[in-house]
Regions:
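Class I S-adenosyl-L-methionine
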Residues: 1-129, 219, 234-235
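Short hydrophobic/aromatic-enriched beta-strand-loop microsegments
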Residues: 66-72, 123-127, 146-151, 194-201
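Short gly/pro/ser/thr-enriched loop/turn and capping motifs at secondary-structure boundaries
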Residues: 56-57, 75-77, 133-137, 206-209
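Class I SAM-dependent methyltransferase SAM-binding "motif I" and its flanking Rossmann-like core
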Residues: 105-169, 211-214, 263
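Residues at the C-termini of beta-strands that transition into short coil/loop
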Residues: 52, 71, 130, 158-161, ...
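A contiguous loop/helix-start segment that scaffolds small-molecule binding in enzyme catalytic cores
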Residues: 2-15, 19-23, 94-98, 154, ...
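Short, polar loop motifs at secondary-structure junctions
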Residues: 51-56, 161, 242-243
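Short, solvent-exposed amphipathic alpha-helical segments in soluble enzyme
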Residues: 36-41, 64-65, 115-118, 143, ...
Length: 267
């Protein structure tokens, strides 16, 4: 695949960029596979902490930026993550726009949770800019969809077994499930998921009308989805123990009927 060098593309600036830390996904390798939003924030960064595996030409957008290589390659000691966390927190007190540039997508096996926890503990504002994860880039190169209507409607992203203390705590994310939420919840509970497993539901992801709710599987299976979401808007359903904290921070799904009514009146 022919790549477009960053030096040949001008990254337009974003208006009103909020000071803080930006965890940006650099994509699977090629510099021109970073998102437009990611490249724009890079162009405005005051300091960038970047992974070892990114295409260094991506840093051409950072003409007047301090660059710090912090990324770990496979097999290096895990304590270096603590050092990265400290660097991000320290930099946020000295610079306006701090970027942590991570290979692939920050949230897919990118150890982003440790960095998020450190930033939240220090009360530092942050934003996550998604990137193309390697599994999708490899599928594109093969010209073979990993999901097909006839053969496979499930995609598993995993690492080597035995690394997680809770291998039974699997995360499931469902596309196009807004009209089958009760069935999804009932099926998962039947398959062994606890009834109090956390669920996050997001409507119109990344759009101005985006809304997020949280509940448990038990609450979800008795909900009336048609009374909670705007007509014909896509909904993503995220299930798993990793979302436990969101039960306290997101709008409760079981109370979303009133919120829905207010939105309907406003529109």
């Amino acid at each position: 695949m022919e790549q477009i060098a960053p030096s040949r593309v001008k990254a337009l600036k974003l208006d009103g960029l909020v000071p803080g830390v930006y965890l940006i996904g650099a994509g699977p390798g090629a510099a021109d596979l970073i998102t437009v939003r990611g490249s724009r924030i890079l162009a405005q960064a005051d300091i960038v902490f970047y992974d070892a595996l990114i295409d260094l030409s991506m840093l051409d957008w950072c003409s007047s930026t301090k660059l710090v290589q912090v990324g770990k390659r496979c097999g290096s000691h895990s304590s270096s993550q603590h050092f990265i966390n400290k660097q991000l927190v320290d930099a946020a007190s000295k610079y306006s726009v701090v970027v942590r540039l991570k290979g692939g997508d920050p949230l897919i096996f990118g150890r982003a949770q440790e960095e998020i926890d450190a930033l939240e503990k220090a009360n530092i504002p942050y934003e996550i800019v998604p990137g193309i994860t390697t599994a999708l880039a490899a599928s594109a190169e093969l010209k073979q969809p990993p999901t097909t209507r006839e053969l496979s409607r499930t995609l598993t992203l995993t690492t080597l077994p035995g690394r997680c203390a809770h291998e039974d705590h699997k995360t499931a994310i469902y596309y196009m499930a807004r009209d089958q939420l009760s069935e999804v919840a009932t099926t998962l509970i039947t398959q062994g998921y606890s009834a109090d497993t956390p669920v996050c539901l997001m409507e119109s992801v990344s759009l101005p009308a985006q809304r997020s709710f949280a509940c448990t599987l038990d609450q979800l299976r008795f909900g009336d989805v048609h009374n909670h979401f705007l007509d014909k808007q896509p909904v993503v359903v995220m299930v798993g123990e990793v979302y436990r904290k969101k039960l306290q921070t997101l709008f409760p799904f079981i109370e979303s009927q009133n919120h829905f009514n207010l939105l309907q009146k406003a529109s």
